Amino acid sequence: MNKSWLRSTIRSFEPYKVPEIKENIVINANESPYNIFDFPAVKDDFLARLAQTPSYHYPDPFAEELRAALADYVSCKPEEVLVGNGGDEIISLIINTFVNAGDTVLVHTPTFDIYGIDAEIVGGNVVSVPDLPGFKRDTKTFLAKVKELQPKLTMICNPNNPTGSILPVSYLEEVLQASANPVVIDEAYLEFSGQESIITKLGQYDNLIVIRTMSKAFGLAGLRLGYAVAQQDVIDALSLTKLVYNMNILTQAAGLATLAHRDDVLRHNVPPTIAARDYLYTELNKIDGVTAYPSVTNFVLLHVADGPAM
């Protein structure tokens, strides 16, 4: 293919590839080990919903019933929620809605790669603030960059992927107050942390956008159900770049069935995951040459001094 056909911003990109893994136990994708359809009540609810939803009809383009259920879960209004085909689509919608070519997008590193990739696709200028030694986030420099650059978007993964660290809500508020533009807080792993959501501050900040997902604590990664939470005018703006029918009837039904039994699902999934995480962290640090870092997520980042030897 003639590469001149491509947008100039992606000509140097390499295709995103997920490596083939032959092992039966896969832990590098931070997936849940629990199948939502192993819950009889959820499975029955899901099948009942599908039986009432003909496949020849297009899905509800705004997933109104699902928005209401998600709003009830996170304690906001339905009009403050927008659903997407996974958190990845929500990230893409945010960037496509707000970022022009040349606009600055501020991130901390290491973090979820998709923030920078999506920003570069539209020609954004990605500015990164690297962690301090020990994967401690450089909060002082990051806040200074927000004040200095006034980025078009500031993106914070909290808890962070891949380090597992979390920033307090008080610091996130400092960033929100310092920025005249949207600040995106990705809370994909929040259910494992025990910390309250920044969504509790939604009414105070018109520049706050929160990303949530049902992939991790609920175990719906294969069904792709992410959502944004923001004040209504921001949700309305994000809807301008959304595909009309972006969420199929299967995912909507699964999301509703899961949320109808959310307390049971979370009680089953989250405490054992936290216990396994803490056990793994402790045991890894007993191995010579291995350093595991504290985590509030469902994974543990580790450094191996001599990888080939291990």
Kindly give the residue locations of the regions a language model identified:
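Short beta-strand-to-turn element immediately C-terminal to the catalytic PLP-Schiff-base lysine
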Residues: 35-37, 225-232, 302-303
